[in-house]
């Protein structure tokens, strides 16, 4: 939306500067994209007069123009087709920079002839995107006068971005009303002189679809002189980019930009029989039409080969469909309602009698027709954002008065009208309490009422409640929040006090839990896992393989038949992903998910669930790789549990809790802490794999993060890892122990046996068989020994071996295998 400062001041009494107005517009939600001051760039251009012309002796398309300027006569070579003697033009003197092209004018020799300046076109001055010749000024222009002042370019232009809900801001009057409410000035009252009709129009009006056209008004005006528009009107329209055509057309454009009400002027002598508004192929119903109206409509809608063809003002022809609303007479279509007028009935310089139309059309129909034919007009832009029906007749009167004042005191008919004004909207109960509740703004009822009244709202205060009725031009005000928004934008968003957010408590358990889960994810990602996110719903058929079905976990309104149950574990979803990957020949997988599992209606736990399958090192071109095994999974789980401040060996549950049925009975274990079950890890049962059509081993762990204790110390700084400068030594041992001793417990004991020397303990063999008693097993380990302060001697190593063997014998009744 464009408008000038002088245009705004027609409706707003203000002494505010351009900058103050621009800032206020943006503050109230009418964002100023640009303020154009063309006078600054074109200040040095002046009015000149072509006294005579003659052909260039060496170029057919050039002319030698004798130009009268402020400083005297000079010769200028010009190639414009409209350059001729007797016209006022725009002169660029030597040294001036031309905006389009950014080049400076120099005294030059063109084909042997001297040229001292340049005669300019609108395109060269960036006043139009294209032009056919040099600018021709009216006779009242004075030679030597500043061009910007004469042309009205000393009037700053505001370019604002209007949101789709603010159709009322597509008129300068609506913008002035908002600025007045903001305190930028005082809104001037519209003075509309009463129009007395001098004859009764014989033009009949028939509107068949009230929903498509809720209001249609027109009046006839006769004996006019369609002369050029006055200077003030031409300047206003030119400054906002509207081409001036004639006074009749210019007035309709002025009303559209001033009040947001599109208008159209038909040449009355070209309208035959009356006006009908209908979809172009609709048949007339006896109920809707009677008498002479029936004859008019029948003629207008009579099937003909060219009835759907429409010749528009833009020179193009369109074929209308049954979805397009047309304005017709007996001879055919005269306009595409709300979008563009027709060429047949357009006003020309010789037009003396007109039909002046102001109407409201269905916004959706206008938008659909405009999109279908790709026609962008000011009328469409305003109509598809809804028109204020209660102002339409006023706009018709204002336009009539303007036409009569410019084109002579012609004869005027009464208003021919279909439809009624929009009924008053229902009141909404608003209060200062509600405003403060949703915006934080504290205002009294009187202050709220004052703002709303300035914006045109009707208010009625009843104690602490203010009944608010939105004005007819605000179609977007339907709920209390809309009213609060209106008050807030006028009060000022910048006045709302900022509230400092409370600092996060770093000791807060929720924050610590969030950080811990994030760390778990980073740990697994660093080990090559991919994170997945799956649905919390699953098929009850799948769920019963993993847990006993419970009635309360069935969904009453599942999004699909296959998602009718709350998942008891994340594993089924991950197994489905494995199955889909295998079907696409992707065999090597490692991924995890953190999400909820549902035990019953009142129990929900957050689980970290991970799966590995396939080969570990498949991407190394120098290695065939090896298949994942349970120790790979245990190592990754150990990293996670270690970060949580626990030891994996201490978390192997020994409380007799049965493994879930979907794990392999002898290749999986529970994870727990005392009596608190934390999860499970191991190999998935072959029956489950068969159900999911998986033909390779799957290893998985499930860790109940909800039950995992938060150990504060683990979030502190870890000790710096020191690397010894002395040589490491390795010793292998094989101990015979009872079958019921857990290997992990023995390795953990050795790791802590002598922390100053033991750097690592690696298990490389477990044996039980014919050479050992049935109740015994042999475990073979490699121990890395290294001191931080010296190189270990043979005596040191022998002493360590003696002490270790004795300790194993005492702790586990183990003996060194010969």
Curated annotation (Swiss-Prot):
Q: Where in the cell is it found?
A: Cytoplasm
Q: Tell me if Amino-acid biosynthesis is a UniProt keyword of this record.
A: no
Residue span(s) of domain FDX-ACB: 724-817
Which residue intervals define the domain tRNA-binding in the entry? Answer: 39-148
Alphabetized, the UniProt keywords read: Aminoacyl-tRNA synthetase, ATP-binding, Cytoplasm, Ligase, Magnesium, Metal-binding, Nucleotide-binding, Protein biosynthesis, RNA-binding, tRNA-binding
Q: Name one GO cellular component term.
A: phenylalanine-tRNA ligase complex
Q: Which reaction does it catalyse?
A: tRNA(Phe) + L-phenylalanine + ATP = L-phenylalanyl-tRNA(Phe) + AMP + diphosphate + H(+)
Domain named B5 is located at: 423-498
How does the cofactor bind to this protein, according to its record?
Answer: Binds 2 magnesium ions per tetramer.
Q: What is its main location?
A: cytoplasm
Signal peptide stretch: none
The kind of enzyme this is, by top-level EC class, is ligase
GO biological process terms, semicolon-separated: phenylalanyl-tRNA aminoacylation
* Cofactor dependence: Mg(2+)
This protein's assembly is summarised as: Tetramer of two alpha and two beta subunits.
Q: Which family does it belong to?
A: Belongs to the phenylalanyl-tRNA synthetase beta subunit family. Type 1 subfamily.
PANTHER family found in the cross-reference section: PHENYLALANINE--TRNA LIGASE BETA SUBUNIT, PHENYLALANYL-TRNA SYNTHETASE BETA CHAIN AND LEUCINE-RICH REPEAT-CONTAINING PROTEIN 47
Q: What is this protein called?
A: Phenylalanine--tRNA ligase beta subunit
Gene that this sequence comes from: pheT
